[in-house]
Each structure stands twice: as structure tokens, then as C-alpha cells.
Amino acid sequence: MVRILANGEIVQDDDPRVRTTTQHRSSSSQQGFFNRGHGAPPGGPGPRQQQAGARLGAAQSPFSDLNRQLVNMGFPQWHLGNHVVEPVTSILLLFLLMMLGVRGLLLVGLVYLVSHLSQR
């Protein structure tokens, strides 16, 4: 069997250049998979940069990762007063509207308002 190198050269499987690139590729992909955070792109920020971000108070949660991915896909953020409504919240509101109707959505809004005002 033959392999094609990155420079376009065709070589046999037992060529040492094929073995070194295959070993390098598999070790770097395993290292990148285990060291990067969930949702981080390959070649993205390493563990040191993520730890530095965590020390600066950057809160990482599944919802923030999902929001970032949805914004990258084109879902808009919109503003309600001085609050930013994230895409996950918009999708949740649409889901609640479909499942519970307008009355259910108003009930959920009332519960949110009461809980938000009771924290003050």
C-alpha cells in the first residue's frame, strides 16, 4: 500500500517519513483532545490560557458554551432594557410558548419576576 505525504510525494507504508508523521499526528491529536476544554477548537487555547481565564473570573458553564456556539452559528442576541437576552434563552422561550401557550409563558415570566424581585 502507498501513502501520500503532505508535499504530494507518494511513498510506501514502510517509509520512515510516513511513520514519523503518523506518530506525530496521533500523539498531538490525543494530547489536544484531553487538554483542551469542551467546545474548544483544535489548536485553540491551551490549558494554561484556560486556567488564566478562570482566574480572571470568566465563568464557564455549558450554557455559556452553547450560547457562544449559537452566536457563531448566527443566532442573534437581543436587548430587553439593559439586559442581554442570549440565544439559549430565546430558544427556551419559543419552546415554552409552543408547549405552554401564551398563558404558560406569562406564568413563567411572573415567577421569574417574583423570584428576581425577592432576591433584592
Swiss-Prot record:
Its main location: membrane. The modification Phosphoserine is found at S61. Residues 12-59 are annotated as: Disordered. The chain crosses the membrane at residues 91-111. Residues 19-39, 47-59 have a biased composition (Low complexity). Keywords: Membrane, Phosphoprotein, Transmembrane, Transmembrane helix. It is found in: Membrane. GO terms for cellular component: membrane. It is a single-pass membrane protein. Signal peptide: none annotated. May play a role in lysosome homeostasis. Belongs to the FAM241 family. This is Protein FAM241B. The gene is Fam241b.
